[in-house]
């Protein structure tokens, strides 16, 4: 399989994630769409690294996965706090956390 197929798949996944972030109001779904966008960028990084025959893209993808793991911890903690205080996981309720 050539790199073009992986890049097209990565673009499709990134677009789906972008549309999900812009359209959805549920914080958990938005969070999953952000993770989908990060995984799409990882796929593109690994595909380009494979094409050029070096490990730089794979190392960058590894660091993106490490940052995504930290993001999962912080993001889920914020979503749980929103749900505990407002009994809703809507993104609109996130601005109410300061009160």
UniProtKB/Swiss-Prot annotation:
Localization: Cell membrane
Domain of life assignment: Bacteria
A Pfam family: Oxidored_q2
Entry annotated with the keyword Ubl conjugation: no
Transmembrane segment boundaries: 3-23, 28-48, 59-79
Predominant subcellular localization, coarse grouping: membrane
Signal peptide: none
Catalytic activity: a quinone + NADH + 5 H(+)(in) = a quinol + NAD(+) + 4 H(+)(out)
GO MF, one example: quinone binding
Record key words, sorted: Cell membrane, Membrane, NAD, Quinone, Translocase, Transmembrane, Transmembrane helix, Transport
InterPro entries per the UniProt record, alphabetical: NADH_UbQ_OxRdtase_chain4L/K (IPR001133), NUOK/Mnh_C1-like (IPR039428)
Role, per record: NDH-1 shuttles electrons from NADH, via FMN and iron-sulfur (Fe-S) centers, to quinones in the respiratory chain. The immediate electron acceptor for the enzyme in this species is believed to be a menaquinone. Couples the redox reaction to proton translocation (for every two electrons transferred, four hydrogen ions are translocated across the cytoplasmic membrane), and thus conserves the redox energy in a proton gradient.
Subunit structure: NDH-1 is composed of 14 different subunits. Subunits NuoA, H, J, K, L, M, N constitute the membrane sector of the complex.
Alphabetical list of NCBIfam families matching this protein: PRK05715.1-2, PRK05715.1-3
Recorded family membership: Belongs to the complex I subunit 4L family.
Name of the molecule in the record: NADH-quinone oxidoreductase subunit K
């Amino acid at each position: 399989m050539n790199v073009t197929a992986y890049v097209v798949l990565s673009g499709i996944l990134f677009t789906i994630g972008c549309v999900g972030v812009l359209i959805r109001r549920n914080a958990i779904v938005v969070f999953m769409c952000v993770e989908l966008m990060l995984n799409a960028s990882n796929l593109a990084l690994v595909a380009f690294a494979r094409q050029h025959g070096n490990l730089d893209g794979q190392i960058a993808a590894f660091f993106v996965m490490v940052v995504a793991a930290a993001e999962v911890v912080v993001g889920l903690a914020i979503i749980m706090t929103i749900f505990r205080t407002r009994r809703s996981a809507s993104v609109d309720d996130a601005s109410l956390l300061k009160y």
